Design a protein with these regions (language model features):
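Catalytic-site neighborhood detector that most strongly recognizes the C-terminal catalytic loop/helix
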Residues: 16, 24, 79, 177-201
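C-terminal catalytic core of tyrosine-transesterase DNA break-rejoin enzymes
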Residues: 39-42, 46, 50-57, 132, ...
Length: 202
């Protein structure tokens, strides 16, 4: 369960971060972030970095959609603007296979919030409010580590590049991310993965 720390920066204007298309973290940066992030958020960011889940998907994730037996995360609902919404397209409604690091993170998280409805939640059991998490946890951590300030959505782009770099099948990666084809993978991420070649014959 997430425990909020006192915000010593109350009254300070939030950091302005320009919107960028794709600016993934390196594996070394991911490891640094996970090493130094607040312990109560380590599982949260581990899942983000190694599944590519969208913010609305991970914030709306309920335990009933975590299948430990099959090692899958079922994307069926999202949390958007304080409301639960069902996934509307075949691409967004999907099953994500858990890598071992994700499986272990969710096992650890279950010990903390397993009696709650939501996987990652406040003390009251309500879904995380992503703006609060970003301002209180994400941006301060990046500043502390001296890393380039990037929006949390870059964790999704990072997951894509890490999976491609590790040699995973592009069609499998596309399904994990909710893409209908592999075209976007190569068009968007190829410049971040040295020696990447297409394996789907296209």
């Amino acid at each position: 369960m997430v425990k909020w720390a006192w915000n010593t920066h109350t009254g300070i204007k939030p950091l302005k971060v320009p919107r960028t298309d794709v600016d993934p973290f390196t594996l070394e940066e991911v490891q640094l972030i996970l090493k130094h992030v607040r312990p109560d958020f380590r599982n949260y960011y581990t899942v983000r970095f190694f599944t590519g889940m969208r913010t609305s998907e991970i914030d709306g994730l309920k335990w009933r959609y975590v299948d430990f037996q099959r090692r899958q995360i079922l994307i069926r609902e999202t949390w958007v603007n304080g409301r639960v919404e069902t996934t509307k397209t075949d691409g967004s409604r999907r099953e994500i296979d858990m890598q071992e690091i994700v499986y272990q993170a969710l096992q650890d998280q279950f010990k903390v919030t397993g009696r709650m409805e939501y996987v990652f939640c406040t003390r009251a059991g309500t879904p995380l409010e992503h703006n609060n998490v970003t301002k209180r946890v994400w941006y301060p951590l990046l500043r502390h580590l001296g890393l380039k300030i990037r929006r949390p959505y870059q964790t999704r782009h990072t997951a894509a590049t890490l999976m491609l770099a590790s040699g995973e099948n592009p069609e499998w990666i596309a399904r994990q991310l909710g893409h209908s084809t592999t075209e976007m993978l190569f068009r968007v991420y190829s410049r971040y993965v040295p020696n990447l070649t297409r394996k789907d014959g296209c």
